[in-house]
Amino acid sequence: MDPTAPLLTHGGEVEEDYAPARSWTDVKRVLSTESAKLWMIAAPVGFNIICQYGVSSVTNIFVGHIGEVELSAVSISLSVIGTFSFGFLLGMGSALETLCGQAYGAGQVNMLGVYMQRSWIILFVSCFFLLPIYIFATPVLRLLGQAEEIAVPAGQFTLLTIPQLFSLAFNFPTSKFLQAQSKVVAIAWIGFVALSLHVIMLWLFIIEFGWGTNGAALAFNITNWGTAIAQIVYVIGWCNEGWTGLSWLAFKEIWAFVRLSIASAVMLCLEIWYMMSIIVLTGRLDNAVIAVDSLSICMNINGLEAMLFIGINAAISVRVSNELGLGRPRAAKYSVYVTVFQSLLIGLVFMVAIIIARDHFAIIFTSSKVLQRAVSKLAYLLGITMVLNSVQPVVSGVAVGGGWQGLVAYINLGCYYIFGLPFGYLLGYIANFGVMGLWSGMIAGTALQTLLLLIVLYKTNWNKEVEETMERMKKWGGSETTSKDILA
């Protein structure tokens, strides 16, 4: 295939791939064009994901002013049990980023709604496999070494959030469906309204009604289901091109779809559970309440930044998959370069801001001076983590857009669990550096993983990726939806 050959876009217009950038003028043109395309997707998606993460963070903030034990319990529930299920279901839903993005780029828009329905079915069934972790959360947390004073209330809170688990089965696929078509402004508005209403509900249930952590769980469930329902309503009402109604085609090739979903889930879960594991290991240290609380506060701040970069992850995944579907290898490559460069700059800004505010930002979460000092000591590690987190999600997004989930899963397994986690355990427990040692070792694992992924990107043959995308679309495309395929 000639990489500069003209191609038809969805509107029927001829659009060529980039010519090679041979001068500073060419570089500036590519930077300007790709930045605009990237942020048209990344800004709304990032804002929405920050709002979604803000639901958990605001819940921790309100609960933190009830008491330290309550904060530890809810933090453990959301960061261990909640993150486990969140990571697995988000990963399962990420298969849509590959298929919907490439199908949309290739002009097979009619298949997007079918793919989304397949993902709904798969994720809903997956929730039942995750249910025992919620039901037996207290013994699971005991098994992971959590103190009894934290494990029991954390398990009780987890039981109350079971309804939220099932909302994710519809939330994630619907979001991916909209992202693939760059219909992301509505997602941002839904996220903003949901977060605003969540704050009001927390104030009513916890402050006014005095329902404590039970009120926090109730607000958490209502907010997450409200978000999922609002997205589905938008799809049915305003996305007629990609949504043609419920279809029997959703059950076709479902096992092959499951395999791709599992590959996506393994890749993402190995990333998300890695940071979750530091919370678990910290819970086994002496003075576990202060250690867990200080680390949880840092992870909340880190998570807010990570949500922005997950938005960029989604955007670059859409950009790469769309361009590969259109047969534009150089556009895919240049979009990656621009995104990595800009993300690194943003990460450096976050690091500087955290270091400057290291003695002050913990007051948002707690009034305890002891806890504030403990958080301040971890600020430098938090800053380094933020820089690494600025690049790593971008590279993972490229992997999803290109369909390389299996390769990245192996890299994640080796860097995180064979190198990073044992190294962190060695520094934290054997060398007695505590939480700072645990975190330092795990940072080393993330740094190694980022380096290897950058090498993979550098060696990628983008023309070959286009050819593989065309083959994938032939396999998954299917036929046009007919009246026989629509469910009555």
Swiss-Prot record:
Phenotype of gene-disrupted mutants: Affected flavonoid levels in the plant. Altered root growth, seed development and germination, and pollen development and release. Enhanced growth and early flowering in comparison to the wild type.
Lipid bilayer topology: Multi-pass membrane protein
Domain of life the protein comes from: Eukaryota
Main localization of the protein described in the UniProt heading: membrane
TM region(s), chain numbering: 38-58, 73-93, 121-141, 150-170, 187-207, 218-238, 262-282, 296-316, 336-356, 379-401, 408-428, 439-459
Pfam families: MatE
Tissue: Highly expressed in inflorescence tissues, especially in floral epidermal guard cells including those of the anthers, stigma, siliques and nectaries. Also detected in the meristematic zone of the root apex and in the elongation zone through to the fully expanded cells of the differentiation zone.
GO biological process assignments: flavonoid biosynthetic process; xenobiotic detoxification by transmembrane export across the plasma membrane
Location(s) in or outside the cell: Vacuole membrane
GO molecular function, one term: antiporter activity
UniProtKB keywords: Flavonoid biosynthesis, Membrane, Transmembrane, Transmembrane helix, Transport, Vacuole
Record GO cellular component, one term: vacuolar membrane
Family membership: Belongs to the multi antimicrobial extrusion (MATE) (TC 2.A.66.1) family.
Chain's role: Multidrug and toxin efflux transporter involved in flavonoid metabolism. Required for proper reproductive development.
PANTHER family attached to this UniProt entry: MULTIDRUG RESISTANCE PROTEIN
NCBIfam families, A to Z: matE (TIGR00797)
Record-given protein name: Protein DETOXIFICATION 35
Originating gene: DTX35
